[in-house]
Amino acid sequence: MRIRIAHETVYSYAVPAHAVIQTLRLTPRNYEGQHVANWRIDVDQDCRLDAHEDAFGNITHTFSCAGPIQTLTVRVDGLVETTDTAGIVRGAIERFPPGLYLRGTDLTAADAGIRAYAEERKALGGDTLATLHALLDDLSRDMVFDKDPTHAATTAVEAFALKRGVCQDFAHVFIAAARHLGIPARYVGGYFLHADGTVDQEAGHAWAEAHVPDLGWVGFDAANGLCPTEQHIRIACGLDYLNAAPIRGSRHGGEGEFLTVKVVVDQALRQVQVQ
């Protein structure tokens, strides 16, 4: 499948910013099942994008620009060719042993409720993969996708108590439960092509990966109740959202920030343009 991405992020400031520094994790890598045909990042300021790799092997671009800055736009356009690998990740850069991904974070800590939920799925019997699929299926059923009650700093505990959230929250709850069971798990950010023909989206997508004996890393998209397919584009991974956030940074000044995000994910059968 050929998938085209157009992702535009616009920062507007009521009071112009004096300076901005940002790190972007917006560039995919090639690995089995994913080939980047072309990819471009543009920033509408006088700055240079410095490419690096972070500790998790993600491609990053860092830039700084001096003000006054009234608006700042980061735009991504790209084309990626994908094939279905049944959710199994092969050929990705692995800088750490799987055990590192047992490390908890504030966003992925498990409380008594998440621990009990995880133990109930394990008690159903079966191997690690069966337990993870039970967790995937039941989280998809028991939590409701709802963008209103949560935000970027919502923890797994908070989202699970609400039984609501966005893809980031589903991923954090899945990770918290898996780690409680002693299964290494990590957060993945990327894009998802909806099967219903929806191309205009308000943000990118997120899911989890867990390390399974004899298979390695396997993806679990709890928000959609499936393992990643050729409809998924994998961008960055880490212990939680903070390690894989598309854009993170800081600014001096720039009070009254307003953020607008437009994402278009479509098969490369027709021209895609963010209006």
Residues of each region from the PLM?
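Linear, non-domain "peripheral" regions
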Residues: 1-119
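Alpha-helical and coiled-coil interaction segments, frequently adjacent to or embedded
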Residues: 273-275
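Hydrophobic/aromatic-rich core segments of domains that either
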Residues: 20, 169-255
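Flexible, active-site-adjacent loop/turn segments at secondary-structure boundaries
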Residues: 11, 15, 24, 34, ...
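Secondary-structure boundary elements
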Residues: 80-84, 90, 96-165, 173, ...
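Structural beta-strand/beta-sheet cores of well-ordered domains, especially the beta-sheet scaffolds
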Residues: 1, 7, 22, 39, ...
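Short capping/connector residues at structural and topological boundaries
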Residues: 18, 31, 70, 106-107, ...
